[in-house]
């Protein structure tokens, strides 16, 4: 027990953030787009609320990647990113990064890093450096493939709902368009009630069943029994993560191959 307390709120609602602020609040922590429903938080608004209460704004930027979204330019004080995902991009490294434009915070973080020893090995560092050379190329392709698939799936008869910030008319679209260069390679799809998610994901050939994301290969998983299985079902359902939800990490493969694979998987249901 480190003595840290927190209040969980929907950060997409700036009024909810404001209402949750207390005298001892030191940080507003958010993830945008969120996992697994791809909800988008207005970073500028969230940071403004935090700063009005002398707190810092910390953004997990993993789903977006720094190519698509630069939270420091939007008022955030600290940005976190999993280097295992888009920064590494090849599913062959485990790493994480903390970035800040505040020199005082940077010195404090560096002191913790030196004291605890949580630094990357030379091999992990090499793999991430290698991957950064192709970050723009990869993320552009992730963006293109994901938007095309989301648009197609949005009209599919066996899909109840598509969660992707790049779809016009969705609640997150205008904010995402304003603060993101591209909408990213992550999406979630909700099958029609009664359809078997296990059968669907196991029928796929190009999409691989795995919990990770952000690599060049397309991955797919079922949050209810994989990434979010430890969350009690009633809490999971309260937060919109239904049994029929499938999370998709769209890779850089040929778009027609990806579409054909999803189509044959859905046709088999």
What are these regions (language model features)?
Residues 1-158, 163:
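Conserved PLP-enzyme active-site core in the AAT-like
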């Amino acid at each position: 027990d480190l003595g840290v307390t927190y209040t969980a709120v929907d950060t997409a609602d700036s009024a909810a953030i404001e209402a949750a602020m207390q005298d001892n609040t030191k940080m507003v922590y958010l993830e945008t787009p969120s996992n697994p429903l791809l909800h988008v938080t207005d970073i500028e608004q969230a940071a403004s609320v935090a700063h009005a209460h002398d707190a810092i704004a910390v953004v997990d930027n993993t789903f977006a990647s720094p190519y698509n979204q630069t939270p420091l330019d939007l008022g955030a004080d600290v940005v976190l990113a999993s280097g295992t995902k888009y920064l590494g991009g090849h599913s062959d490294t485990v790493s994480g990064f903390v970035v800040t434009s505040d020199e005082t915070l940077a010195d404090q973080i560096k002191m913790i890093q030196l004291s605890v020893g949580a630094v990357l090995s030379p091999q992990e560092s090499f793999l991430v450096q290698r991957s950064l050379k192709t970050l723009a190329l990869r993320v552009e392709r992730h963006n293109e493939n994901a938007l095309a698939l989301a648009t197609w799936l949005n009209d599919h008869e066996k899909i109840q709902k598509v969660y992707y910030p790049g779809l016009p008319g969705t609640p997150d679209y205008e904010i995402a368009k304003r603060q993101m260069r591209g909408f990213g390679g992550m999406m979630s799809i909700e099958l029609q009630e009664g359809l078997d998610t296990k059968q669907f994901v196991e029928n796929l050939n190009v999409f691989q069943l795995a919990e990770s994301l952000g690599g060049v290969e397309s991955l797919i998983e079922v949050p209810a029994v994989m990434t979010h299985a430890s969350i009690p079902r009633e809490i999971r359902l309260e937060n919109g993560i239904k049994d029929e939800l499938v999370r998709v990490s769209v890779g850089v493969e040929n778009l027609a191959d990806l579409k054909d694979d999803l189509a044959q998987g859905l046709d088999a249901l």
